Amino acid sequence: MSTLEGRGFTEEQEALVVKSWSAMKPNAGELGLKFFLKIFEIAPSAQKLFSFLKDSNVPLERNPKLKSHAMSVFLMTCESAVQLRKAGKVTVRESSLKKLGASHFKHGVADEHFEVTKFALLETIKEAVPETWSPEMKNAWGEAYDKLVAAIKLEMKPSS
């Protein structure tokens, strides 16, 4: 497990993240796809970062590889957020974190990409749980996302 601290993630933030994730989880596949479509809407050039989208004539919203990738990224991001306070750190398996870091490094993912992704994630969650969305919930998810990104960035180096 990564040892990046979950300090500063309060009980209230945890409750907001857990409550919203409980409401979203049954629709994780659909929400994951919406999340990625938002990323590509904001930054169309981001599509070039995904090898499985190159030379594909399948519309993004129907692309099975994108759907699968989007769901796994959305699930990993949300599950990481939910357990942050309890574990006291980002708990993505160490091997996964190393793989994520190496992959993001290899594809040239930069800070701007992480910012676009954060914005798209927060917008996706806001649309998924409009009745409970609040500035506090936005901050809680933003904080959890920032901790995950910091853990990934620590591993952003060539794979060995």
Curated annotation (Swiss-Prot):
Binds 1 heme group per subunit. Heme b binds at S51, K65, H69, K99, S103, H104. InterPro entries: Globin, Globin-like_sf, Globin/Proto, Leghaemoglobin-like, Leghaemoglobin_Fe_BS. GO terms for molecular function: heme binding; metal ion binding; oxidoreductase activity; oxygen binding; oxygen carrier activity. A motif (Homodimerization) lies at residues 41-45, 111-123. It catalyses: Fe(III)-heme b-[protein] + nitric oxide + H2O = Fe(II)-heme b-[protein] + nitrite + 2 H(+). The keyword Lipoprotein does not apply. CDD domains: class1_nsHb-like. It is found in: Cytoplasm; Nucleus. GO terms for cellular component: cytoplasm; nucleus. It comes from the Eukaryota. Keywords: Cytoplasm, Heme, Iron, Metal-binding, Nitrogen fixation, Nucleus, Oxidoreductase, Oxygen transport, Transport. The keyword Cytoplasm applies. It is an enzyme of class 1 (oxidoreductase). The record marks K138 as: Homodimerization. Phytoglobin that reduces nitrite to nitric oxide (NO) under anoxic conditions (e.g. during flooding or in waterlogged soil) and upon root nodulation. Required for general plant development and during nodulation, especially for the onset of symbiosis. Monitors nitric oxide (NO) levels during early phase of the nitrogen-fixing symbiosis and buffers oxygen in functioning nodules. May not function as an oxygen storage or transport protein. Has an unusually high affinity for O(2) through a hexacoordinate heme iron because of a very low dissociation constant. Belongs to the plant globin family. Homodimer. This is Anaerobic nitrite reductase HBII. The lineage of its organism: Eukaryota, Viridiplantae, Streptophyta, Embryophyta, Tracheophyta.
